[in-house]
Swiss-Prot record:
Alphabetical keyword list: Cell membrane, Cytoplasm, Hydrolase, Membrane, Protease, Thiol protease, Zymogen
Biological source species: Xenopus laevis (African clawed frog)
Keyword Cell wall biogenesis/degradation attributed: no
Gene Ontology cellular component list: AIM2 inflammasome complex; IPAF inflammasome complex; NLRP3 inflammasome complex; plasma membrane
GO terms assigned for molecular function: cysteine-type endopeptidase activity
Propeptide: 1-100, 287-296
PTM notes: The two subunits are derived from the precursor sequence by an autocatalytic mechanism.
Active site location: H218, C274
Record's subcellular location: Cytoplasm; Cell membrane
Quaternary assembly: Heterotetramer that consists of two anti-parallel arranged heterodimers, each one formed by a 20 kDa (Caspase-1 subunit p20) and a 10 kDa (Caspase-1 subunit p10) subunit.
A Pfam family annotated for this UniProt entry: CARD
Protein name: Caspase-1-A
Gene expressing this chain: casp1-a
Amino acid sequence: MTAQLNKVRRAIIDGCNPAMISDLLDDLREKNVLVDSEVEHIKESNNTNRDRCRAMIDSVKKKGDDPSNILLESLVKNHKTLAKSLGLHEPPMAPVPIQEHNADTIKNKDIKGVIPCSAEEFKKIQDTQGDKIYDVRKREGRKGLALIICNEKFENLNERHGAKVDLDGMTKLLNELGYQVHPHTNLTKTEMVKVMKEFAAQEEHADSDSTFIVLMSHGDRQGVCGTDSKKTEKEKGQYEVTNLLEIDEIFSTFNNVNCSKLRNKPKVIIIQACRGENKGGLLVRDDVASPPLEDDGLHFVQREADFICFCSSTPDTVSWRDPTKGSVFITHLIEKMNEYAHCQPLGDIFLEVQSLFKDKCPNSRSQMPTQERCTLTKKFYLFPGY
C-alpha cells in the first residue's frame, strides 16, 4: 500500500484543504498511526496546507504498508469526491480493523505491530479489575514519554554490532504504544546521567500515566557502561569497570523525591546489557567483566515505589546479541509486547518473554531475563490505541 499511496501522493496534495487535513490527522491519531507529538509537529512546522499534507503523507509512508493503507481507507470513507477522482472507489485490502484485533485469532508470525486494545477489551478489564489496576488517562490529554539510551560505539570496548536494530525496534514499539520517544545514542556515563535527569524533569510527565526508560549497552553486575567505560585488571582475575552508570543511580533519578511528577505512576526500566561472564550460547555478548560474587541484598524505602525493572539476564550472566538481528532479549520482548499488550498486564507479558528463554535454553547457565526491584502496587495495563 505504500506504493499505491506514493502513486496518488501528488494528487492528494493538490486536492487537500484544511478540513480534510484535520480530519485525516485526527483519524491517524485515533488509529495509533501517528502519536500526538507527530501530529503537532506536522501542524506547527509547516506553514501551508500543501506542506502539512505533504508532511502527513510522508510520515505515514515511512511507517510501511499498513499505516499507508489506513490513510487511504480514511480518505475513501471520509472524502469520497477526492477519493473517486483518484480512482480509489473501494477501500484497499486492509489488515483486520483495529478494534477487531484478537490475539486468539492471529498467529504470532502474522503480527507486524502492536495489537490495539478494543473498546470491549478495555471495558472488560476495567469492569473485572477495577481498583486493582493503575489509572489510565484519557488519550486526548495524555503525554506519555519514553527515554531510550543505546550505546553502540565505545572508546575502549568492542562495538555492539546489531544495536541499531534494537534501537529501531524499541522506538517503533514505544511509538505504537502511544509514547513520545526521546532517543539518545553513544553517551558517556556523565552524559547518560545528564540525559536521565533532564528527562525526569520534563513537565509532560505531569500529564502522563506512566513512563519507559530503556538502556542498551555493555554492562556488568553493577550497572550499564558509558561510551567511556574501561575494563582494568586490579588483581589477577579481578576486574574493575570505570565510568559505569550504576543501577541504583537509575532508580534514584526517577524515585518519588527526584521525579515527583511520576509519583504513583508506573515507571518501567528495561536494561539490555550483560551482568557477568557465565554463559551458555555462541552469539555476541554485551558484557565487560564479572566482578567477585557479593551479597546482592536490596533495601527498598518509601521513596522508591511503582517501579518494574526487566533485565536481559540474571546477575553474573551474559546477554546474547546477534550482529545482524539485534539482541535476543529485545527481539522477544518486542514480539510479546506486540502480541499481548492489548490484553495482559505488563508483568505477565514479561513472564511470557521469560518462558521463551526457558523453553529454548534449558541449560541453567544460559541467558534468563529477570524482573527486579518490582514495587508496582497494582497491575499495569498499557491499553494500546485506546
